[in-house]
A protein has these predicted regions:
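Sec-dependent N-terminal signal peptides
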Residues: 4-13
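Conserved catalytic scaffold of divalent metal-dependent phosphoesterases
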Residues: 156-158
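Short gly/pro/ser/thr-enriched loop/turn and capping motifs at secondary-structure boundaries
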Residues: 75-76, 160, 215-218
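A metal-dependent hydrolase metal-coordination microenvironment
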Residues: 22-150, 154, 167, 171, ...
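Charged catalytic cores and adjacent phosphate/nucleic-acid-binding surfaces used
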Residues: 19-38, 54-57, 118-126, 164-303
């Protein structure tokens, strides 16, 4: 009679980071894909934020981001009396100029800011944000669609529009999803996560996103000096370009990084984990059936 073999594992981890800048958000590329670290929802003084666009660019570069989108509110302009700006593309133009000597890709976007339904949504890859200024909320979405923007539902669980933090899915939302007027959904916004929004993404095949929606200072909001990080969307694109990024977003090739956790669908989440962890060495401890395995972690995730 054969005796069962009991094999024990002793696992150690090494981290493949230099430690020169611990705040940089770092994840490996996947076979055939570039992993782009993106924050696609933020504000400056050109809507209701507290900083000039150059600060958003500087913060993004410090965090090692690949892509940001300027997404000022179309309808809500807190500082318009102090900073008049008839051109709603101005925030983007400034940010793009400030980023010209870096590798940061800046997208033109706007936040369509309406009552529920449909609520708030971001349209990115815009050609002209001014054309989204209209009384009819659906006309704003249709104009964004006309400009081939990628449109996603912002903070559907936001307490100001959903007091119980549920996702108030309306028939209008379903019609908009069916007509490609909503292509993605924030499952993470700022410091909040919605499991219901994630389920909605699964049910309606929406792209999942996580964003900072930052209005003030990134370092203060996410306690960067204490080891925190902003929420971001990891987008798996063929190359770092607007066209490739847009295609990847439309194909749902994303994972969210939030509070030191990875959230996503298995088709890209599992490859990301597999490419983050590598077996560095494996050997038996003398005179035992214990295998000492050393794994290398070349990502920010604390596996």
């Amino acid at each position: 009679m054969q005796k069962p073999l009991l094999l024990s594992l002793l696992i150690s981890f090494t981290v493949a980071h230099s430690g020169k800048n611990d705040r940089i958000i770092d994840f490996p590329d996947l076979p055939g894909f570039k992993t782009l670290v993106c924050d696609l929802h933020m504000h400056t003084v050109f809507s209701d934020g507290s900083v000039w666009p150059n600060i958003r660019v500087m913060e993004a570069n410090k965090d090692g981001l690949d892509v940001i989108a300027t997404t000022e509110h179309i309808e809500y302009q807190s500082w318009i009396s102090d900073i008049p700006h008839p051109d709603r593309n101005r925030s983007y133009d400034l940010a793009k100029g400030f980023a010209k000597n870096s590798d940061l890709l800046v997208l033109n976007g706007s936040e369509i800011t309406r009552d529920m339904p449909p609520g708030h949504a971001n349209a990115i890859f815009l050609k002209d944000a001014n054309k989204l200024i209209t009384d009819d909320p659906i006309e704003a979405f249709l104009e964004a669609r006309k400009q081939d923007a990628f449109i996603f539902w912002n903070h559907p669980h936001w307490a100001s529009q959903s007091p119980d933090a549920s996702v108030p899915l309306d028939q209008l939302h379903i019609e908009m999803i069916n007509n490609d007027l909503i292509e993605g959904i924030e499952i993470v916004n700022d410091t909040t996560y919605s499991n219901e929004a994630f389920q909605l993404a699964l049910d309606y095949d929406l792209t999942i996103l996580g964003t900072s929606d930052i209005h003030e200072i990134i370092d203060w909001q996410y306690r960067i000096p204490s080891g925190g990080h902003r929420p971001v969307t990891l987008v798996f694109a063929r190359e770092k370009s607007e066209s490739s990024l847009k295609k990847a977003l439309r194909n749902g090739q994303t994972v969210v990084w939030f509070n030191k956790k990875l959230i996503g669908k298995s088709d890209f989440l599992l490859p990301l984990i597999n490419n983050s962890l590598k077996v560095k060495s494996a050997s038996y401890i003398s005179n035992t059936t214990i295998v000492h395995v050393v794994l290398s972690n070349n990502s920010d995730a604390p596996f």
